[in-house]
Amino acid sequence: MKEQKIRVKLKAFDIELIDQSAQSIVASVKKTGARVSGPIPLPTSIRKVTVIRSPHVNIKSREQFEMRIYKRLIDIFDVTPQTTESLKKLALPAGVDVQLK
């Protein structure tokens, strides 16, 4: 029989928020007796946008903004029904995107 595994991917703009969410997921899963691997930090995506500062004059004057997307990966092994229930009942902050596979 194949071992059951849940892969949790977290994405957020705030690094403190994503780390708190990852720690709460790991703590709730460990209480149910499942094995946890992670949180594994994935590469941070950086999106840069360059805009012109003034609408008419000084066309060479530009300003750059960046948006950083932080990602974490958590693998959960030996999944029990209590583990899935604890993941369903877990309340995470609004700024964190969660994907379960």
Curated annotation (Swiss-Prot):
One Gene Ontology cellular component annotation held by this UniProt entry: ribosome
What the entry lists under InterPro entries is as follows: Ribosomal_uS10, Ribosomal_uS10_CS, Ribosomal_uS10_dom, Ribosomal_uS10_dom_sf
UniProt keyword list: Ribonucleoprotein, Ribosomal protein
Q: What's a GO biological-process term for it?
A: translation
Output the Pfam families linked to this UniProt entry.
Ribosomal_S10
The disulfide bonds in this chain are: none
Q: Which domain of life is it from?
A: Bacteria
Q: Name one GO molecular function term.
A: tRNA binding
Self-association state and partner proteins as the record states: Part of the 30S ribosomal subunit.
Q: Which family does it belong to?
A: Belongs to the universal ribosomal protein uS10 family.
- Stored NCBIfam families: PRK00596.1 (NF001861), rpsJ_bact (TIGR01049)
Q: What does this protein do?
A: Involved in the binding of tRNA to the ribosomes.
* Protein name, UniProt field: Small ribosomal subunit protein uS10
What is the scientific name of the source organism? Answer: Brachyspira hyodysenteriae (strain ATCC 49526 / WA1)
